[in-house]
UniProtKB/Swiss-Prot annotation:
Keywords, in A-Z order: Ribonucleoprotein, Ribosomal protein, RNA-binding, rRNA-binding, tRNA-binding
InterPro entries per record: Ribosomal_uS7 (IPR000235), Ribosomal_uS7_bac/org-type (IPR005717), Ribosomal_uS7_CS (IPR020606), Ribosomal_uS7_dom (IPR023798), Ribosomal_uS7_dom_sf (IPR036823)
Single annotated GO MF: rRNA binding
Similarity comment text for this entry: Belongs to the universal ribosomal protein uS7 family.
Keyword RNA-binding among record annotations: yes
Protein name according to UniProt: Small ribosomal subunit protein uS7
Length: 156
């Protein structure tokens, strides 16, 4: 890791349809093998499915779903003396968003619907309604942090 100066973060250009940086970042999370147009197609199809099912603005559903999944606290391993402890740590804002997006993609890929856009729409709607596998992952993360509260004084 460089010690001289902090490396500047690259700017993410907002996407073309919704003019949102969050959507553009999520397209990058969906993308595999550099196929960005395929990833955009999947996300926009998922948004159309969500709009069809709920009659609400898909961007609002998406943003609320991401906010519902964002973890506040997580555990990190730290070696103290000869044993490893799981230490609860607060999650930084940009990591919260990144984790939420990663969890949505992981659990939407393991869903049973046929098309990826349907899987993604289903997971986003579940997250919007505070249910589903990605919400369970967030709750498990919080539960782990709560269980290891006794080791919070080992924080660095």
């Amino acid at each position: 890791m460089p010690r001289r100066r902090e490396v500047p973060k690259r700017e993410v250009l907002p996407d073309s349809r919704y003019n949102s940086e969050l959507v553009a970042k999520f397209v990058n999370v969906i993308m595999r093998d550099g196929k960005k147009s395929v990833a955009e197609g999947i996300l926009y199809d998922a948004f159309d499915i969500m709009e069809e099912r709920t009659k609400e603005a898909p961007l609002e559903i998406f943003e609320k779903a991401i906010n519902n999944i964002k973890p506040v606290i997580e555990v990190k391993s730290r070696r103290v003396g000869g044993s490893t402890y799981q230490i609860p740590m607060e999650v930084r804002a940009n990591r919260r968003t990144a984790l939420a997006m990663k969890w949505i993609m992981t659990y939407s890929r393991s869903r049973s619907e046929k098309k990826m856009s349907a899987k993604l729409a289903g997971e986003l709607l579940d997250a919007y309604n505070n249910r589903g596998a990605s919400i369970k992952k967030k709750e498990d993360t919080h539960r782990m942090a709560e269980a290891n509260k006794a080791f919070a004084h080992y924080r660095w």
